[in-house]
Amino acid sequence: MTPFEFRQAVRHRDFRGPTAGHCGDYAQANLAILPAAHAHDFLRFCHANPKPCPLLGVGEPGDFRVPVLGRDIDIRTDVPAYNVYRDGELSERVESIETLWQDDFVVFAIGCSFSFEHMLAKEGIGLRHVEEGRNVPMYRTTIANRRAGVFGGELVVSMRPLRGADAIRAVQITSRFPGVHGAPVHIGDPAELGIADLARPEFGDAVTIRAGELPVYWACGVTPQTALMAAKLPLAIAHAPGHMLMTDITNASLAIF
């Protein structure tokens, strides 16, 4: 299935699940959608926090197409699920934002680690959440983001359990793709990130960690949602964690070496 066909399936509500493992050669995007009055500060926030917030594209005010991301994209309908934030609180999860769209909304598309998972799989590195049919586990750390205007919050990380040799190889592979979070930010003890219990992720689903495996953590594109919470905007929208926008951008084009 091509990214265009995948987006059409989402648009017509034929697909509603997590997007990990789909259209493996193409980049997936996290989304943050907010009023234009706050767009400059959010852009500064992304530039100040490039590890969790690598930008793939930014729309014009009121533009729900964002053509730099792909053909015939409609941001309002082409994501399997959206989180709606009101005054910094998660208000609802919806399957379309057509009725919520505002003429001053600006779309920020942020790189996603699902994009490099295909590269890991091709090298024989197993992905537990894919094997178990679950959403990747994501954790809110105690590491503060660099602030920009009203945007702050804490770093969110995704976690994949790997054997030592696979963890080393994963560092080598993902370092080539800073546009989709790059190399891990931590390997090992979750307490060093302020994570109390790996069995209780704030976002996504817990996965099995087997004997001899290390938890490997990547900066995560759910991080902007902690910034939206901290900003307490009257209305802001993001993708539901694990439910991404499929783009026409090839993963190969994002490699820096």
UniProtKB/Swiss-Prot annotation:
It comes from the Bacteria. Belongs to the D-glutamate cyclase family. PANTHER family: D-GLUTAMATE CYCLASE, MITOCHONDRIAL (PTHR32022:SF10). The lineage of its organism: Bacteria, Pseudomonadati, Pseudomonadota, Betaproteobacteria, Burkholderiales. This is Putative hydro-lyase Bphy_2364. It holds the Pfam family D-Glu_cyclase. SUPFAM superfamilies: PSTPO5379-like. The keyword Transferase does not apply. Its EC number is 4.2.1.-. Keywords: Lyase. GO terms for molecular function: lyase activity.
